[in-house]
UniProtKB/Swiss-Prot annotation:
It comes from Emericella nidulans (strain FGSC A4 / ATCC 38163 / CBS 112.46 / NRRL 194 / M139). Acts as a component of the essential kinetochore-associated NDC80 complex, which is required for chromosome segregation and spindle checkpoint activity. It is found in: Nucleus; Chromosome, Centromere, Kinetochore; Cytoplasm, Cytoskeleton, Microtubule organizing center, Spindle pole body. This is Probable kinetochore protein spc24. SUPFAM superfamilies: Kinetochore globular domain. Component of the NDC80 complex, which consists of ndc80, nuf2, spc24 and spc25. GO terms for cellular component: cytoplasm; Ndc80 complex; nucleus; spindle pole body. PANTHER family: KINETOCHORE PROTEIN SPC24 (PTHR22142:SF2), PTHR22142. Residues 42-129 form a coiled coil. GO terms for biological process: cell division; chromosome segregation; sister chromatid biorientation. Belongs to the SPC24 family.
Length: 200
């Protein structure tokens, strides 16, 4: 009987029915995503800075060449160098603008993930109120089914999920009784019937 069970054993079995692994995994995935986004952003920034430094050095080199061209008073080379410098300047400005836009986008994603993480932390491992209530209702049904099973009674649901059949096993006699549950009979009636069948 249920009352003969050790309370610690019942509590242990009940705790085993709680499923907090998905929430813990979700928090872990969010933390991993935040770390990955941060690393990606830092890598992009380093690549952009490296590219800008290379372009700056190249620009300096071109400037030196330009100065030498001016000193040589070669108008055609000077004009070509200026055009090339303007082109590279435009490319650098465009690259910087794209990097700034990408940085703002990544920052926006990071803020959304931080808000999501804060919501999950506020809800705790048990989830929000609606989730907790649904889990408690499911746990209560599972606990009742376990108690019935421990007594030798299997309650079977129909296609709609309603419990309409009970299989009662009398281990002392080796008998098996199948009872169709009809809503017109009270729970008290079925409790007495189940008990008498198990004891009979």
């Amino acid at each position: 009987m249920l009352l003969d069970e050790n309370p610690s054993t019942l509590i242990h079995h009940t705790i085993g029915n709680f499923n907090i692994a998905p929430d813990k995994q979700a928090v872990s995935r969010i933390n991993d995503s935040l770390a990955t986004l941060q690393q990606s952003r830092e890598l992009r920034m380093r690549e952009a800075e490296s590219s800008l430094r290379k372009l700056s050095r190249h620009l300096q080199s071109l400037s030196t060449q330009h100065e030498e061209a001016v000193a040589a008073h070669d108008a055609s080379k000077h004009a070509a160098a200026m055009v090339e410098l303007d082109t590279k300047k435009f490319r650098i400005a465009k690259a910087a603008s794209e990097l700034e836009i990408e940085s703002e986008r990544l920052e926006g994603e990071l803020e959304m993930l931080k808000e999501r993480l804060a919501d999950l932390e506020a809800q705790g491992l048990e989830g929000d109120e609606a989730t907790r209530r649904e889990r408690e209702a499911d746990d209560a049904i599972l606990l009742r089914l376990k108690i019935y099973r421990a007594l030798g009674i299997d309650i079977e649901p129909d296609e709609a999920g309603n419990f309409t059949k009970a299989v009662i096993r009398n281990s002392r006699k080796g008998d098996v009784h199948v009872v169709n549950l009809d809503p017109k009979f009270s729970r008290f009636f079925y409790a007495n019937y189940f008990w008498s069948t198990m004891q009979g």
